[in-house]
Amino acid sequence: FSVFVKKYPDCAAICGNGQPRLATLLLLDFLKENHSFYYHGDFDPEGLLIAQRLKERYGERLRLWNYRADWYERYLSDVNLSEVRMKKLEKVYLPELLEVKMQMQKRKRAAYQEAMLDMLEPEKNEWITRSVK
């Protein structure tokens, strides 16, 4: 996160560090009337559930950033997901997350956002380039 905000100081960013806490939710609630958000988190069962909850809370104001099977495959870690963690995927139903969910059910591994930093750059993502300028 710090690398991203230092590299792109004109891009407003919020780091929630895992499960969004009350302060993060209150800030987003305050901003939601006049702002749209892009969310990116870990590609693991818990991360998909966070993305789903945020999408449910903020609807069209929140866009999920690159929750795609090709990103999941590209950034797979060596972290194997336990059966307890895999069971959490049963609660993921949001259409935007199903592609990643299905791949995760096959591979049983996580992909973490820290590994994706090279692709979280405005010039590689047209939508954020427009937001930054």
Where does each model-flagged region fall?
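Acidic beta-strand-to-loop metal/phosphate-binding motif
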Residues: 35-44
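Long, charged alpha-helical interface segments
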Residues: 79-133
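Short, flexible loop segments at boundaries between secondary-structure elements
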Residues: 66-82
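Structural alpha-beta junctions
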Residues: 57-63
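Switch/connector loops and helix/strand junctions flanking conserved nucleotide-binding motifs
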Residues: 47-50, 74
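Acidic, glycine-rich catalytic loops of TOPRIM or P-loop NTPase phosphate-binding modules used
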Residues: 1-33, 46, 63-71
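Short, aromatic/basic amphipathic alpha-helical patches
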Residues: 50-56
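Long, hydrophilic "mature protein body" segments
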Residues: 36-37, 59, 69-72, 85-86
